[in-house]
Curated annotation (Swiss-Prot):
PANTHER family: DNA REPLICATION AND REPAIR PROTEIN RECF. ATP binds at residues 30-37. This is DNA replication and repair protein RecF. Keywords: ATP-binding, Cytoplasm, DNA damage, DNA repair, DNA replication, DNA-binding, Nucleotide-binding, SOS response. The keyword DNA-binding applies. One of its GO terms (cellular component) is cytoplasm. It is found in: Cytoplasm. Gene3D superfamilies: P-loop containing nucleotide triphosphate hydrolases, RecF/RecN/SMC, N-terminal domain.
Length: 368
């Protein structure tokens, strides 16, 4: 899939913008604080209905307006789709082909994106919540049912934690009802995550071995707070551990086990990647991003759109070449932001160049 056209009204520092793109590589050049990242953020927001930079929608609204409108024309294998998101103080409205969508799980996945931003380099050593978010964003685009089950899980988890914080003593019968619901939704969330990580590991290791010239292997490990011996009995084991932890959870005022506490670990040649070098970290993250692209296509039959936000300067020539070779081979529409073309090596033909200045975007040329 690829985005043919994007229109922004009152988004960040863009008062009004209408732009069309190449189905291949699109490069946005400009000094810092001109709107390059805002532009990629808008594409990300149109896809996922959320920003990767802020949780406050009001920060997305142009300073002298009260509403935001984003519309995009997306070319999928199945045909052209029009997406629209409108933001105001009354909330947000999402539409597909002018039809309002009642549930996010009906909207997300229509346009898939993979974002590679500087903060992704913290994925290995950052907080566990970053790695869970990484899984949730990809799975939510690939499997809409996952978003629904995760939403139900989080709703019951909130209810259970609220009860634990307010209760003066344990009502075992009431907790048993919540435990059953939490274990049911949570087990399905974990099953989806385990299948996804197993598939992602295969793709990521293939890319990582290519980047390292066969010197390194990459493995991923989904580490659950729920102890189980096989995937088919996650529900029973989760339910048992919830019941066993009633007293501990009551004392701590929160739920001690479940997918909300699960971890994702990375290993290079069998060694925990927390102890890897900076160069190895870059190769690992690059391998993951290329694996995301490959896996989304394998599981859905359509390519995602790749957003590279000021990361090419973080990669040496070898890693840049591997990345560009992948997107060209897979025919992935790619958006790159940079302050200068000097940061990019071995650019292929057919690139569309845009210049970004103070919230305006001007097309330069197509390189043939």
């Amino acid at each position: 899939m690829w985005i043919k056209e994007l229109e922004l009204k009152h988004y960040r520092n863009y008062d009004h913008l209408l732009a069309s793109f190449s189905s291949g590589l699109n490069v946005f050049i400009g000094n810092n604080a001109q709107g390059k990242t805002n532009f990629l953020e808008a594409i990300y927001f149109l896809s996922l209905t959320r920003s990767h930079r802020t949780r406050a929608d009001k920060e997305l609204i142009h300073f002298d307006h009260s509403t935001v409108s984003l519309t995009g024309k997306i070319q999928r294998i199945s045909g052209t789709v029009d997406l629209e998101i409108n933001l105001s103080d009354k909330g947000r409205v999402t539409k597909i082909n002018a039809l309002k969508q009642a549930k996010l799980s009906d909207y997300i996945g229509t346009m898939m994106v993979v974002l590679f931003a500087p903060e992704d380099l913290q994925l290995v050593k950052g907080a566990p919540s970053l790695r869970r978010k990484f899984i949730d964003i990809d799975l939510g685009q690939i499997k809409p049912v996952y978003l629904s089950e995760l939403s139900h899980y989080n709703h019951v988890l909130k209810q259970r934690n609220s009860y634990l914080k307010s209760a003066q003593q344990i009502d075992a019968a009431f907790l048993a009802v919540l435990d059953e619901q939490l274990a049911s939704y949570g087990a399905r969330v974990m099953e989806h995550r385990i299948d996804f990580i197993n598939a992602l590991e295969k793709e990521a290791n293939t890319h990582h071995q290519a980047i390292s010239n066969g010197l390194e292997s990459l493995s991923l490990s989904y580490q659950s707070s729920v102890v189980f011996d096989k995937k088919t009995n996650i529900y029973q084991q989760f339910l048992y551990q919830l019941e066993k932890n009633h007293q501990k959870d009551f004392f701590r005022k929160n739920t001690s086990v479940g997918p909300h506490r699960d971890e994702l670990a990375f290993y290079i040649n069998g060694m925990n990647a927390n102890f890897a070098s900076q160069g190895q970290h870059r190769s690992l993250i690059l391998s993951l991003k290329m694996a995301e692209v490959s896996l989304m296509k394998a599981l859905t039959g359509d390519n995602p759109i790749l957003l590279l936000d000021d990361v090419m300067s973080e990669l040496d020539n070898t890693r840049q070449t591997k990345l560009l070779e992948t997107v060209i081979k897979e025919n992935v529409q790619t958006f790159i932001t940079t302050t200068s073309l000097d940061h990019l090596s071995q650019l292929p033909e057919g690139i569309r160049i845009f210049h970004v200045t103070k919230g305006t975007v001007q097309i330069d040329s197509d390189i043939h």
